[in-house]
Amino acid sequence: MAEDTQGTDTPSTAPINVPDKPALEGLEAALTRRWLAEGTYKFNPDTTREQVYSIDTPPPTASGSLHVGHMFSFTQTDVLARYQRMIGKNVFYPMGWDDNGLPTERRVQNYYGVRCDPATPYDAGYRAPAEPAKNQRDFDVVSRRNFIELCEELAVEDEKVFESLFQQLGLSVDWQLTYRTIDDASREVSQRAFLANLAAGDAYMAEAPTLWDITFRTAVAQAELEDREVAGAYYRYPFFTEDGEKIYVETTRPELLAACAALVANPDDERYQPLFGKKVTSPVFGVEVEVRAHALAKADKGSGIAMVCTFGDLTDVTWWRELQLPTRAIVGRDGRIIGETPDWITTDAGRTAYEAIAGKTVFSAKEAVVELLAAEDLIDGEPKKIMHPVNFYEKGDKPLEVVTSRQWYYRNGGRDEERRARLIARGHEIDFHPAFMRSRFENWISGLNGDWLVSRQRFFGVPIPVWYPLDADGNPQYGAPIVPLDEQLPVDPAADAAPGYDEAQRGVPGGFAGDADILDTWATSSLTPQIVGGWSRDEDLFAKVFPFDLRPQGHDIIRTWLFSSVVQADALQHAAPWKHAAISGWILDPDRKKMSKSKGNVVVPTDVLDEFGSDAVRYWATSAKLGADTAYEIAQMKIGRRLAIKLLNASKFVLNLGATENSVVSTDLSVLTNPLDRAVLAQLAEVVRQSTKAFENYDYARALQITESFFWQFTDDYVELIKDRAYGAAGDAEQASVLAALATSLDTLLRLFAPFLPFATEEVWGWWRNGSVHVAQWPLAVDVDGDTTLLATVGTALSGVRKAKSEAKVKQRTEVLSATITASESLTTQLKAGLGDLKAASNARELTLVAGEGELTVSDVVLAAPAEQPKA
């Protein structure tokens, strides 16, 4: 039912060599070594685009350890890769490591006990402490260059561990196609993309309110936000009109009272319409602000009128921008209230009050402002305690602030309807699996409220490749950035002089200053197709792999990785980056919560692989459909292990039948004479058709279910039914027929199972075939003149006889003197075709077939006296 890789009708056979005691133990290490040595999964660049199947593999974050979720999603990708390889595709299957950005930076800080200060001189002989300090205040202070060296050193060690684990899992990656998102090639591609976007007007710098993480001291993009429910309270206090009337506001952030730039109410709210355009005075600080109208104000929220502070949240930013309000920022980038009293606070009482909060964290400042309000008896009632969603950076542990800063942005449709529509159209060039995941992509685009902020105020990452000329006073001319020559890439403006300047001119009037920021890690990770495909470096390779055939990833990063990759490919290649997107679900713990390192509920992959074996873990992973959140189930892994062991043992039985020294097993179908043999192969042909269709639809779980269901029927029923004939009891012709059916079935089943159980199938393949099953051809459905339901019917009758023996508490080999099988006329006809095998398997002298109505039943079973009673 299959052809081998040489394209011949007869697979390449070898003398049978079956071990006495087949076992799964030790297969992973031995076969991995062989695959690596033989280049089993090596991509052949001497090919055409039509022959290639290219995969944009997700690079896992190199920040300590993998978890069971990686095994789950990467295995799902691997079975798709293995199927494509077996149908004749030249599979381009790389592996990357995402080792730039905050996760690596944070791990290095804690692992070595260091923190970076760009002002610290480089120490060429620096060695990190043997034992890191327990308190971060005692960490070694190192230069940016020293810090980056430590990041690279630790990332390389982590990646070795990751590679070893993925090989143990059986990923059919070409391990010569690896990259790191911080290596020279990745930095070159990332910087070249930035410069291309800059030249096209798709990258720009702006000074504007920015979401800011006070722990990491960096700007954060919309895609990196995470809403978390936190405890808070509404405080109600008044502003005062000119005639002393109290206008009450209700806010969860009284600490921003000194930053208030206006009060705002809905234009249709009759309570406040008389106040629009008039001034009111803030309590405690005594600052006049105007009452304004805006449609975003909600009449039914709180008192219906709100403070506009610069800036409490993104709604404040919208009001500030659209109402053209003054900027009155009081929160610094360190999350503390700015020390210098702002000039808009002019009264002595107000300036004294500000001194009471200056330098405090926002949390301490809140307490101080509440005390100041209470001291003047201005708090109306008790604070109303609530739980409410607050913006956090997804990797941070403190609420985000909004501060004004100068940042770089990529245009992503957040402010451009035409671009937004174009990006949605790009999404329709991609087949999403499952299809409903497309709506998450489109909903994200539709909900964007700004362009993509790509600059970060951190140390370890891809430097933004620009410098700025300094005027006569030493001020940077941000509007006239200096860009590197193409052949200079990659560059580090903090270490490399700008073109046309020398290092002595750095930081002096009339000289230059390098941009100190790095690119957001997603700005580089979004370019994985371009990085691994050789864009701008190997155009021949790029033409063969781009657009990639497959992007596999989790559904939680559709808004980040998938979307940003579409943005980059649209801008750079004017195309979608892939043809298909396979979206994995989450792994859930026993409480049905997502497993994640941050939650502390992850399972260590090595423990699971060592206990159950890789094939068992792969079985669990591929039993789940794409997009489905799946429970971590030990029971499912046990089933997978049982399946792999059964495959070894059943294969041993088949191959040992009639085997002699140096013999080979024949799959010559011309010798088929028995109806049951033809039936099992006809049924198997249908399994091949259905499994192939499922794989073509990216439904590997369906392919596994179909194959596994047939396999158990094959081993439990067919193998039991034909044993007598297989041993020659019915003559040479019948034996030849059954041996050909067995060998053909085994050959086909090994190929069908190969993507799922790569170790067990490869082990068995080596017992009687040359080469690797993983580069053998996917089985072809060969039409055999047989009844596809015959095996099920005869198997049901056999089960009925077995049940009677079990109920009589005798061994299954006990002779049946007589029994009656009642079935419909059509089933009776089928039973006649398999009656010889049924009698032999049942050890029955006489089986009487009776045509009747209803389901098949076995009755009137008369058993011979057992030679030996079964043990209790």
Feature annotation, model-predicted:
Residues 3, 7-9, 236, 448-523, ...:
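Feature 926 captures the class I aminoacyl-tRNA synthetase adenylation module centered on the KMSKS loop
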Residues 216, 285, 396-397, 470-472, ...:
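Short Cys/His-rich metal-coordination motifs, predominantly Zn2+-binding knuckles/fingers
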Residues 69-81, 89, 97-98, 186-189, ...:
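Structured ligand/cofactor/substrate-binding pocket environments in proteins
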Residues 113-146, 345-357, 481-506:
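Charged, glycine/proline-rich intrinsically disordered loops and linkers
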Residues 49-57, 79, 130-138, 163-170, ...:
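Active-site-adjacent bridging/hinge elements
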